[in-house]
Amino acid sequence: MKIFIDDGSTNIKLAWLEDGDVKTLISPNSFKPEWSFSLLDDAAPANYEIDGEKFSFDPLSADAVVTTETRYQYSDVNVVAIQHALQQTGLKAQPVDVIVTLPISEYLDANNQKNKQNIERKKKNVMREVRVQGCDAFVIRSVAVLPESIPAGFSVLAGLEDDESLLIVDLGGTTLDVSHVRSKMTGITKTWCDPNIGVSLITSGVKEQMAVHANTRVSSFQADNII
């Protein structure tokens, strides 16, 4: 099975085909660096282990690992977040082929060519084994990597005339990716990325204000809900 994954810094977005229908899922990133437990027998905690490091999904933990930075793309918690999202699909754990993303600033080098080192680093990271407490884990069989923002315009670009183009602006959780793409994906005229502009700036501001004025520490997930 092939699963398309936009593994952004704030949410993991999945899309896959099931019985001919397109299914989608959004899974927020909120993982603390320890396991959790549940008092309910039928509510198993979402506990994961990778290379001896333990993580658990906890949307309310103010101590959740920070994911709104570029290094998240190659981190333990990135792999855990992908596995957690796969576990939420309702699909039986199985080997899967995935397509993931990198910010344009990571996908391209200074000469606007594919940064093969970063792409290979991303592939190796995503393919690492994750153990899931109490159930089987999905096994990543193969990984392909695409740049953020550009795939969003595939369907529109296919219908453009030869002398037309599309400007794609992707304001994500951590980065702002902009691409000027020629009709039918015949070429990319210009790309630009600011790795320091994202909606997490607003989330961080809300968390700071809650801590200062309400004497309350909240998670990024809670701050997003407040917004």
Please report, for each region that a protein language model flagged, where it lies by residue.
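Active-site-proximal alpha-helical scaffolds that flank and shape metal-associated catalytic sites
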Residues: 169-173
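Gly/Ser/Thr-rich beta-alpha loop segments that engage phosphate groups in nucleotides
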Residues: 10, 174-175
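A structural feature that tracks compact, well-ordered secondary-structure segments
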Residues: 177-179
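A cytosolic small-molecule/anion-sensing beta-strand core signal
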Residues: 182
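A mobile "lid/hinge" subdomain adjacent to the ATP/sugar-phosphate binding pocket shared
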Residues: 208-227
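RNase H-like, metal-dependent nuclease domains and their acidic two-metal-ion catalytic environment used
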Residues: 203-205
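Nucleotide/phosphate-binding catalytic cleft detector across ATP-hydrolyzing
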Residues: 1-168, 185-200, 221-222, 227
